[in-house]
Amino acid sequence: MSFNHKTIEELHDLLVAKEISATELTQKTLEDIKSREEAVGSFITVSEEAALKQAAAIDAKGIDADNLMSGIPLAVKDNISTKGILTTAASKMLYNYEPIFDATSVANAYAKDMIVIGKTNMDEFAMGGSTETSYFKKTKNAWDHTKVPGGSSGGSATAVASGQVRLSLGSDTGGSIRQPAAFNGVVGLKPTYGTVSRYGLIAFGSSLDQIGPFAPTVKENAQLLNVIASSDVKDATSAPVRIADYTSKIGRDIKGMKIAFPKEYLGEGIDPKIKETVLAAAKQFEALGATVEEVSLPHSKYGVAVYYIIASSEASSNLQRFDGIRYGFRADDAKNLDEIYVNTRSQGFGDEVKRRIMLGTFSLSSGYYDAYFKKAGQVRTLIIEDFDKVFADYDLILGPTTPAVAFGLDTLNHDPVAMYLADLLTIPVNLAGLPGISIPAGFVDGLPVGLQLIGPKYAEETIYQAAAAFEAVTDYHKQQPIIFGGDK
């Protein structure tokens, strides 16, 4: 018997009542992973021995009835440090790297007796939108194995969508949680920048990166955020704001809530069928008592260009540490120090990572800094101001998560610009440091469509309130792919 259809609260009740043990739940989860892994390829590492050892220790001391997450398995994206468990960032550069410390988000999960079951596949160093740039494997969409799962947190999304695990962690720099959540029909949240500590997250774009949760439902997503969110002295960008309970508004009605619908989010490049689906969702919010009105975010159209200058510039700096000296891959054909650096980085990084390092280095160079990096920062400020103006009058912003549904494997990986444009609607949220969620909102051609809700900083509770209200009157989150046990 599989437990992957049980909610976290249902699993907790079974564990407290001793109808199952943490060890049994872990064993069943490992079986679910193994039985589906060949089809979807969600994991780089499955930490079976460590997970069973941890489960046995939890059983020995007993399940804490007041701790919802006690004994619950968790999958973790492979750019989040896990002590003693390979953390590769899906790169040849770190193919053998075992951290000697846990990321704060992982330490918080361990503190709640969660069980790290394995590390999920991703785009190399989180650079990509399809999980095809991984050094190890290509992950496949849970609904259609000929399609991409999205990225860069593709493995974390498919692990939940396919029923391998109930909960997982990802990271989001320009849409890397929300886009794969949309493509796989699960709930994915990018928290406000600083809400979850970045300590232990392998850095890509330091002013953009944020760790966040995946789950099948809105409430379970909020329950996992309760675990991982914390202020942290080890992260200088950690926010001092701490919400006591992110589930506190779930179940409340949304009558009187004011929701903005940017006209740019239904503009050029958006699939007409996606437009229909999202407009229907807007009508549903109106039926629930909210007001939905059209607004403008005029500078959002520059988001992709701004993002790829800023993110690539930050990446070119952050990735300088990978040089073959301290840890990870080192080229064995080097005759001197210069060759160690050049050969290691040439052989250790994949094409997309090298592309972004070169773009970032160019943008930061003395002759082009003002024209590119400085200008991108100025336009970023305009994007932030656009959001501020809207949130002066509205509680939330609504729109599609992605311009289209999941695309085919190997169709865009040789067209970087087309791949980058898949994040057109998610990138501005990262540039502004705002919270955003993707929830299931329907299907187009048999593939899931994600609805994105964006809030002002630290408005996760309100986002969850609105998302849960929509979820309560729809059944999209209940529909499951065949690999999970559904009929689609």
Swiss-Prot record:
Domain of life: Bacteria
GO cellular component: glutamyl-tRNA(Gln) amidotransferase complex
HAMAP family recorded: GatA
Function recorded in the entry: Allows the formation of correctly charged Gln-tRNA(Gln) through the transamidation of misacylated Glu-tRNA(Gln) in organisms which lack glutaminyl-tRNA synthetase. The reaction takes place in the presence of glutamine and ATP through an activated gamma-phospho-Glu-tRNA(Gln).
Protein name according to UniProt: Glutamyl-tRNA(Gln) amidotransferase subunit A
Pfam families referenced in this protein's UniProt entry, alphabetically: Amidase
Residues annotated as catalytic: K77 (charge relay system), S152 (charge relay system), S176 (acyl-ester intermediate)
Organism in which the protein naturally occurs: Streptococcus pyogenes serotype M12 (strain MGAS2096)
Catalytic function, reaction form: L-glutamyl-tRNA(Gln) + L-glutamine + ATP + H2O = L-glutaminyl-tRNA(Gln) + L-glutamate + ADP + phosphate + H(+)
PROSITE patterns, per database record: AMIDASES
Coiled coil: none
Enzyme Commission no: 6.3.5.7
Subunit structure: Heterotrimer of A, B and C subunits.
NCBIfam families linked to this entry: gatA (TIGR00132)
GO BP: translation
UniProt entry keywords in alphabetical sequence: ATP-binding, Ligase, Nucleotide-binding, Protein biosynthesis
GO MF annotation list: ATP binding; glutaminyl-tRNA synthase (glutamine-hydrolyzing) activity
Family membership: Belongs to the amidase family. GatA subfamily.
